[in-house]
Curated annotation (Swiss-Prot):
SUPFAM superfamilies named in the record: Immunoglobulin
Quaternary assembly: Alpha-beta TR is a heterodimer composed of an alpha and beta chain; disulfide-linked. The alpha-beta TR is associated with the transmembrane signaling CD3 coreceptor proteins to form the TR-CD3 (TcR or TCR). The assembly of alpha-beta TR heterodimers with CD3 occurs in the endoplasmic reticulum where a single alpha-beta TR heterodimer associates with one CD3D-CD3E heterodimer, one CD3G-CD3E heterodimer and one CD247 homodimer forming a stable octameric structure. CD3D-CD3E and CD3G-CD3E heterodimers preferentially associate with TR alpha and TR beta chains, respectively.
GO annotations of cellular component type: plasma membrane; T cell receptor complex
Organism domain of life: Eukaryota
GO biological process, one term: cell surface receptor signaling pathway
Compartments it resides in: Cell membrane
Disulphide-bonded residues: 42-111
Domain Ig-like: start-end pairs: 22-115
Name of this protein: T cell receptor beta variable 7-4
Predominant localisation class: membrane
Organism name: Homo sapiens (Human)
Keywords noted in UniProt: Adaptive immunity, Cell membrane, Disulfide bond, Immunity, Immunoglobulin domain, Membrane, Receptor, Signal, T cell receptor
Gene3D superfamilies in the record: Immunoglobulins
Record's signal peptide: 1-21
Length: 115
């Protein structure tokens, strides 16, 4: 039986308004075999232009993986280049992709948005 990698995906809220609307992520959690590709989607709050992806590994603080303002992507971490990427196919959507998952990728991944 192959080794499985568990990636928890949780909701991140940053700059939410009084209506309670927030970002949504899918899937909410993901279990993947080592070596498989994973894609996580984030839908931002309407009107927010900046989207952030964070990662929190067990026993560690959160780290910014990447953020984008409109279509401009900025890398803010020492994440393994080539395996992690984020795309912004629409103004309000970002997709974090992890290629060839490894044991060390097991973490909580969350997104947030701001004006």
């Amino acid at each position: 039986m192959g080794t499985r990698l568990l990636c928890w995906v949780v909701l991140g809220f940053l700059g939410t308004d009084h209506t309670g609307a927030g970002v949504s992520q899918s899937p909410r959690y993901k279990v993947a075999k080592r070596g498989r590709d994973v894609a996580l989607r984030c839908d931002s709050i309407s009107g927010h232009v900046t989207l952030y992806w964070y990662r929190q590994t067990l026993g560690q603080g959160s780290e910014v993986l990447t953020y984008s303002q409109s279509d401009a992507q900025r890398d803010k971490s020492g994440r393994p280049s080539g395996r992690f990427s984020a795309e912004r196919p629409e103004r309000s959507v970002s997709t974090l992709k992890i290629q060839r998952t490894e044991q060390g990728d097991s973490a909580v991944y969350l997104c947030a948005s701001s004006l």
